Amino acid sequence: MNYIQNYRISSNSVYAPKFGASNPVAGKESQPQSKEQEIKSLSNVTPDYGVKAPMSYTKTGELKISDDLTAQCYKLANGQKVVIVPKDGTTVVKTYVNTGSMNEPDNLRGISHYIEHNLFNGSEDLGDKVFFDEVNKMGANTNASTSFSVTDYYISSNLLDDTDLENKIKLHAGMIQSPKFLLDKLEKEKNIVNSEINMCLSEDENIGFTQTVKNLFNIKSSSNDLVAGSTDNITALTRDDVVNYFNNNYYPANMTTVITGEVNPDETMKLVSKYFNSQKVPNLNRHFETMTPIDKPIRQDLISSKSEGGASIFLGFVGPENNNGEDIVKVNALYTLLGDLANSRFSSLEQKYSTGVSLQKERISSKPNDNSILVFETEVKDDYVEPFLKDLYSNISKIAVTPPSEKELTAIKNKMKMGHDRWLECSHALNHAVGSSILDGRSEYLSKYNEMI
C-alpha cells in the first residue's frame, strides 16, 4: 500500500469569506503622557488574544525548473522551508510533514493516519467555525494523505477573490499548527479510521505490498498494514498519545510548504510568515523504524480466499537512497524501458500471460539517506505463477547483459522528457515533485532533470 488518501471535497461556490484584519497588540502597555491623552475605556472592541507577530524569514535561493518556471525558496526563522512557484492555473497550498508510519512505535502503528483525519476536525485558530464549511465557501478542494514516511495536506482552487489566497493560507496553517483534538471528535474518528483499516485489510494488494516491505527490510510489526495500523491500536489510543506524537513530529523544521499557482512570491511569503508562526520544537527523541535490508532472497506465499483463481505477485528490491536524484532518474528510465515504450522489454511477457507489470518506487523512511523500495507488481492466473516468475526473473536478468540500444535509449529520453513537461503543466504534480525533492535535499532533480536524462 502506498498511501491512504482521505477527505476530498469540492464546490462550485465562488464566495470567499472575509477574515477581518487583526490589529497588532502591544507587548507592553504604554503610559499616557497627559491627562488629556489618557483613554479610560474602549467600547465595541473585542480583544484578540491570538494575535502573533509574523515569523521572520530569509530567501535561500532560486531553482530554475524550466524556461518558464522558477521556484523561489525561503526558510522561516522557526526552520520551516517554503517554496513558491508562480504558474498559470490552479493555486495549490500544500504542506509536507516529514513523518509517517515508519516514525511510529509498533503499539501506536496507525497514529499518523489517525492524526491526519483529526486535523480536519477544528483548530484553535479557526475557533467555532467548521473547516470544511470555510473551504466550501471558497469553492476550493482539500485533501490529505498518509504514507510510510510523509503526511501531506493541501487546499487548492483558482483564486477568484482578492482574499482567497490569504484565507487558504490561514485555514491551512491553523489546521496544521493548532488542532484542538477534542475528546468527542477523537472518539468519533476512531470508528471512521477503523472502518478504513478493515477496508485496507480486505484488499490483497495492500496485504501483499505491506508484506513485501516487511520482508525486504526485516520489519517486525503486529499490524498487517504498516500505514493503516490495526484497529486494536487505534481503539486503544489516548488523547495524550495523540498530543505527544503530534508535538514531537509536527514541528516547523520538520515541514515543507509548497505553493504553486497564480501568486506573487513576495506577497505570498508575507502571508506565510504571518500565519505559519509556530515556535514549536520536539521535546523527545523521534522514533525511526530500523530498516535492515535482507542479504538473500525471501519468498512468501499467502493464501487468500478472495483471489478467485488469480494470484497477485509482488517482487521487491532495495531502491536508491531518498536523496539520490541521479539514481531516481535512472529508475524512471528503467521503468520506461521495461513497460512504457511501444515495444518495451516486458511487452512479450505481458502478452504471453495476458497481464500488465507495473514498477513503482516508494519512499519508506523519512531519513534522506535511507533506501527506498522498488516493487514489481502484477496479477496472473494461479496456474501461471511459477512459469511467470521464471520468465520475469529472466527478463530482469537480461537487462544487466543487454543494455538499451541507441534506439531504445533515444525513445526512453524522449518519453521521459515528455512526461516531465506534462507534470510541469499541472499545479498538483509540480507541487508534489517540488515537495518530495525538497524534503530529501535533492534540488538537482528539479533544476537539472533534463540534463540528467
Residue ranges and their predicted role:
Residues 1-49:
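Non-Sec secretion/translocation targeting segments of pathogen effectors
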Residues 44-52, 97, 124, 131-245, ...:
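Acidic/histidine-enriched segments that form metal/cofactor-coordinating
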Residues 152-156, 251-262, 374-379:
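Short cationic amphipathic helices and targeting signals
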Residues 373-405:
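Extended amphipathic alpha-helical segments enriched in small hydrophobics
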Residues 85-87, 148, 363:
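Peptidyl-prolyl cis-trans isomerase
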